[in-house]
Amino acid sequence: MPHAESYDYIIVGAGSAGCVLANRLSADPRCSVLLLEAGGWDRDPMIHIPLGWGKILTERRHDWMYFCEPEDNVGGRRVECARGKVIGGSSSTNAMAYVRGNRGDYDRWAATGLSEWSYDKVLPYFRKQESWEGGANQYRGGNGPVSTQFCRYKDTLIDAFAQASVQAGYAQTKDYNGERQEGFGRLQMTISKGRRASTASAYLRPVLKRPNLTVLTEASATRIVLEGARATGVTINHRGGERTVLARKEVLLAGGVINTPQLMMLSGIGAQDELAAHGVQTRVNLPAVGKNLQDHVSVILMYRRRAPGGPFLRNMRADRIGFDFVKTYLTGRGFSGDVPGGVVAFLKSGPARPLPDVQLLFTAAPLAAWPYFKPFKAPFADGFATRIVATQPESRGAVKLASADPSAAPLIHQNFLASPKDWESLRAGFRVARDLAAQPSMQPFIEAEFFPGPKCQSDDEIDEHIRKTSITVHHPAGTCRMGADAASVVDPQLRVRGVDRLRVVDASVMPDLVCGNINAAVIMIAEKAADLIASSKEGRAVQ
């Protein structure tokens, strides 16, 4: 890296959004781009083998190791908040589900004054990002960087669960990322030839040889350099040494929902009273920074499976799965090239709901399988699970500084289940999951419900199960809210209010959560941001 450390664009965070920005901005050979990543390269085979996701998640490999603050609504627990700390960010560590959200999510954004973020306006960026196995149509893209496909995991239990949804009278959808989201359908994944299709593999790796793109790993941003009301660079800690890199055009924050507001506050951009409490000088009084935190909270229902069990149990013996991991990693073909999912649903908990507020994720495997492997025999009884997710949460939390030390984790106040409607969504979804298990097609597979168990029946008992066991499904958003109003953190062009040459491009700009997993939406935001940046001269602040 040359001594004159200045670039046209500095991107902070090589995650779901940052890798997209690096690709699109460096496509102009006249622009120099620096991409900073606090983690390392994505060399771990477990990242790339889809079934390795279980170990990535439970062992929290390549993770920031964040935990939420204790909260009464979840029994005083500190719920873990997994965030990817590796090239590709959470797109390298997530469960690979590909869900865009509902048309109504984006039209709701537009109704607040964000007219350029309506469904019709963002659809081209969803199409641009993907290469859908079914080919291009008016909703789907056929030539984008991210390969998307239906989950190909095969198990008769998955077919039985899909049939149960028909027997119970629920609506069906052939493509929840197409014309209609609501209903039961086959899960879609970001997998290509038996490997995870992260933004690192899809967007970044193909362009690493561009001479105008520099990537620094193990480089943590500690402060945004401000000259008056203008962002001119970033101070970084790179492998133990601190230095400053300068941006001639813009600094682009893509560190994610937790790290982006933390960096802004450490740099003096935030609520004046909160910054003063930690001895941070206020440069821009922007009280909304870190506020509006929201996430998808979930609860699970698990069953034991009748003998002889399914393919997951048979293949998870250490001698078999070890061989299969190697085979899949080298050839892209094998049992490990998919995950034991298959069916997903987006449902309304009641007729008054304008959009689906419940997501069901069916898994043809017991959660007790995650701490694999023990030699030569499966260390768990076979089973399956349905995860119930509240997709339209009304509860709002905040990310706050714990100290002025950049190496200290911030305080994450999720404020889970603060709204009665969030409880209603989970409760309703729980009863739907039980209804599905009671259908005729499921009876040959069910030995017994074991979590929480058949004694959990009343609303109070279900609520206690939710309180004791609910977790996040790792879809945080909103902490640098985009809006047309002066109280928002960023304007509709993602420019930070009160600061020139500074934008936020990640899930923190979402005004509110979309219905479903958020990786596709974050990629869309980055694709759209790249066009906004390319069409902008300096990214001047909006007052």
From Swiss-Prot:
Post-translational modification: The N-terminus is blocked.
Gene3D superfamilies registered for this protein in UniProt: FAD/NAD(P)-binding domain, Glucose Oxidase, domain 3
Gene Ontology BP annotations: vitamin B6 catabolic process
Main location: membrane
TM region(s), chain numbering: none
Signal peptide start and end residues: none
InterPro entries referenced in this protein's UniProt entry, alphabetically: FAD/NAD-bd_sf, GMC_OxRdtase, GMC_OxRdtase_N, GMC_OxRtase_C
Class of the enzyme per the UniProt entry, highest EC level: oxidoreductase
Source superkingdom: Bacteria
Active site: H475 (proton acceptor)
UniProt membrane topology term: Peripheral membrane protein
GO annotation, cellular component aspect: plasma membrane
Pathway: Cofactor degradation; B6 vitamer degradation
Summary of pH dependence: Optimum pH is 8.5.
EC number of the protein: 1.1.99.42
Swiss-Prot/TrEMBL catalytic activity: 4-pyridoxate + A = 5-formyl-3-hydroxy-2-methylpyridine-4-carboxylate + AH2
Residues noted as binding FAD in the record, renumbered to the chain: S16, A17, E37, A38
Entry's family note: Belongs to the GMC oxidoreductase family.
Purpose: Involved in the degradation of pyridoxine (vitamin B(6)). Catalyzes the oxidation of 4-pyridoxic acid to 5-formyl-3-hydroxy-2-methylpyridine-4-carboxylate.
Designated name of the protein: 4-pyridoxate dehydrogenase
Organism for this UniProt entry: Mesorhizobium japonicum (strain LMG 29417 / CECT 9101 / MAFF 303099) (Mesorhizobium loti (strain MAFF 303099))
